[in-house]
A protein has these predicted regions:
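Glycine-rich, flexible loop/turn motifs
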Residues: 1, 50-51, 56, 72, ...
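Single conserved hydrophobic/aromatic residue that forms the stacking wall/gate
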Residues: 1-7, 12, 217-220, 224-227
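Flexible, acidic/His-enriched mid-domain "rim/lid" segments that flank
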Residues: 8-9, 13-47, 109-137, 153, ...
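Acidic/histidine-enriched ion/cofactor-binding microenvironments in catalytic or ligand-binding pockets
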Residues: 68-100, 176-215, 219
């Protein structure tokens, strides 16, 4: 988003979004359906006086996108889809209050997961950390994308290019696009007050698409503020 948001409004929307996300993560257990996780997310958002941002967005039928294993993103919750031991589940949540949207996601391993999958989750989290660290006033979007791409590829992983991060504010998806690849010093310059979602989407090359997605919001100041 290319304009500044009011600080208190951002704090409220991001707190509600985070509460709903972690409620969904806690509900993610073997034998639980993806629809039940969605129900928990929906109830958490509405109980805080907010509206689920995803419900009805582009026709989406639920409050949370829940993607399991090889599903990339935007998975639709299903009353028949049971979570199993060893699954990895990405839960993506959006909440709107006071006219402002929040957007956050987390990928959780259910019970014991394969060592290579655990490493993928850890590397993706570090990709996010490095992307946040690059979100400094005066840097450019290419600095963020390069930080994510360089770390992922150092492990031989692939970066998904079909989907990118984005600005977020009055609308769920705003300019600028925030790719997970790029070259330092290129792209839109980061300015104080910008609010963006950094969304690393990383996969195991040649072994199916396991794509943990971690989102954050930040404001580009002298140092980034992780909301």
């Amino acid at each position: 988003m290319l304009r500044s948001l009011v600080g208190s409004e951002m704090c409220i929307r991001d707190r509600i979004t985070a509460e709903a996300l972690w409620a969904g993560v806690r509900a993610c257990k073997p034998g639980t359906t993806t629809w039940e996780i969605n129900r928990v997310v929906h109830e958490t958002i509405t109980s805080r006086g907010a509206t689920p941002s995803f419900l009805g967005l582009y026709g989406f039928p639920a409050a949370a996108c829940i993607s399991v294993n090889e599903e990339l993103i935007h998975g639709i919750p299903d009353k028949k889809h049971l979570i199993k031991e060893g699954d990895i589940v990405s839960i993506d949540v959006g909440a709107c209050i006071g006219g402002y949207h929040g957007d956050s996601a987390y990928t959780v391993g259910v019970g014991e997961i394969a060592p290579e999958t655990k490493q993928l989750l850890e590397v993706t989290q570090e990709c996010l950390n490095r992307g946040i660290a690059a979100a400094l006033k005066g840097n450019r979007l290419g600095d963020i994308g390069s930080a994510v791409q360089t770390y992922a590829e150092s492990y031989g992983y692939g970066v998904v290019r079909e989907y990118v991060g984005h600005g977020v504010g009055r609308k769920m998806h705003e300019d600028p696009e925030v790719p997970n690849y790029g070259h330092p010093g290129r792209g839109v310059r980061l300015m104080p007050g910008m609010t963006i979602a950094i969304e690393p989407m990383i996969n195991l090359k040649g072994e199916g698409v396991y794509t943990p997605v971690s989102y954050t919001h930040l404001r580009a100041h002298e140092t980034p503020e992780h909301l």
